[in-house]
Curated annotation (Swiss-Prot):
SMART domains: TOPRIM (SM00493)
NCBIfam families hit by this protein: recR
Name of the protein: Recombination protein RecR
InterPro entries, per the entry: DNA_Rcmb_RecR, Rcmb_RecR, Rcmb_RecR_Znf, TOPRIM_dom, TOPRIM_RecR
GO molecular function: DNA binding; zinc ion binding
Function summary: May play a role in DNA repair. It seems to be involved in an RecBC-independent recombinational process of DNA repair. It may act with RecF and RecO.
Annotated keywords: DNA damage, DNA recombination, DNA repair, Metal-binding, Zinc, Zinc-finger
C4-type zinc finger segments: 58-73
Gene designation per UniProt: recR
């Protein structure tokens, strides 16, 4: 039994394809869009089309960009000898917000995940290796601290160390303001492993 006209059902289905959006949220988004003034809906649709039509991947790092190379890769003030490897373009935004990293990035566009059938050839590892031109001194692996992220980090270390590149991993552990009693064993172990002198 259909509750909505076909056009509304189709819009709900399209919204539900977005990550983290279930059917109920897709319904709410659809109803919100239908209640917007026509000009706002057209502006939203135009912005989607323009972004999809003009945004591409940087040929150097794989980040989203409207110029090639991207603003980070083409910035002469960035340290090109320091490359931070991340899983997705959104991870670059997280790193940049910290304002502590002045190197460049490499986006893998995924991780090695045997459970999902994703091997090393499924992500941008060849491109990473091709960037090791003698000028890169250190690669910081900033994949997520889960099984797939750790497996990917270990694989990157294995393929880059023979090239004479220093490979480091971002530290993991207790968040600032966190209590030890609420930390799980793996987090505590990582915090101990990543300890440093004060």
């Amino acid at each position: 039994m259909e509750f909505y006209p076909v056009a509304i059902e189709k819009l709900i289905e399209e919204f539900a394809k977005l990550p983290g959006v279930g059917y109920k949220t897709a319904q709410r988004l659809t109803m919100h869009v239908l209640n917007l003034p026509k000009e706002e809906v057209e502006g939203f649709a135009d912005a989607l089309k323009k972004a999809r039509g003009t945004i591409k991947y940087c040929s150097v790092c794989g980040n989203y960009t409207d110029t090639d190379p991207c603003a980070i890769c083409s910035n002469p003030n960035r340290d090109k000898s320091l490359v931070c490897v991340v899983e997705e373009p959104k991870d670059i935004i997280s790193m940049e917000k910290v304002r502590e990293f002045n190197g460049v990035y490499h986006v893998l566009h995924g991780v090695i995940s045997p459970m999902l059938g994703k091997g090393p050839d499924s992500i941008k590892l060849r491109e990473l290796v091709s960037r090791m031109n003698g000028k890169v001194k250190e690669v910081i692996v900033a994949t997520n601290p889960n099984v797939d992220g750790e497996a990917t980090a270990m694989y990157i270390s294995k393929i880059l160390k023979p090239l004479g590149v220093k490979v480091t991993r971002i530290a993991h552990g207790i968040p600032v303001g966190g209590d030890l009693e609420y930390a799980d064993e793996v987090t505590l172990a990582k915090a101990l492993e990543g300890r440093r002198e004060i």
